[in-house]
């Protein structure tokens, strides 16, 4: 049997990726690691993000003898995938903003990317747009505050619609017909975003594509096996800081049976 999937994000927005994975692999063991001590990632310096993420993910992957790592964070994926793939012997899957499918379906040839400021400014994002949406008008909208709104919603707090309306105001005045949710936190707010922008707008995220990629890898023959002497809770959550009771409740509802700290000297 291959080891559990290790899903990583700065917060619990990566649960949107986990949900898609469970749709296609309901019996697959998963562990979740989130670096809530440094949330939100979209405002971190690149050097800090890279050094912290790489050490954190590698340590936890080795600790649980993971069979595959999913970096369920756009901000991190744009920076750390190459290094992780060089240092880990297991597959590493990242999240790519759904620019390509958005360009294919936009009738107006006018799309938007809603992401963290970090993802918006990365050269990789521009490369995606140049490669797959050259014939489209692409508008970029960056927000870290939406990340915290999503975190609050997952903890059981009602979404502040007045604040959401203010944050989405630049999009509402645009004539785009397709909006890419380029942060794994943002699908959590999909209902509220549609309520604000109108039901006709098409929202796209990368969750299904990531799940399909993971399934494809698990069906292959190259995944390492867990050592027989390794014992791990296959439904564990690991955190880098304390979490609110509301978030703990949500994680239990997601089926996780233990929540414990990740101990590391390299987090800060």
Swiss-Prot record:
Pfam families: Asp_Glu_race
GO biological process annotation, one example: regulation of cell shape
Record keywords: Cell shape, Cell wall biogenesis/degradation, Isomerase, Peptidoglycan synthesis
Keyword Amino-acid biosynthesis: no
InterPro entries: Asp/Glu/hydantoin_racemase (IPR015942), Asp/Glu_race (IPR001920), Asp/Glu_racemase_AS_1 (IPR018187), Asp/Glu_racemase_AS_2 (IPR033134), Glu_race (IPR004391)
UniProt-annotated catalytic positions: 73 (proton donor/acceptor), 183 (proton donor/acceptor)
An example Gene Ontology molecular-function term: glutamate racemase activity
EC code(s) of this entry: 5.1.1.3
Keyword Isomerase annotated: yes
Top-level class of the enzyme under EC nomenclature: isomerase
Domain of life: Bacteria
Pathway(s) the chain acts in: Cell wall biogenesis; peptidoglycan biosynthesis
Reactions catalysed, as given in the entry: L-glutamate = D-glutamate
Function: Provides the (R)-glutamate required for cell wall biosynthesis.
Entry's family note: Belongs to the aspartate/glutamate racemases family.
Protein name as it appears in the record: Glutamate racemase
Gene coding for it: murI
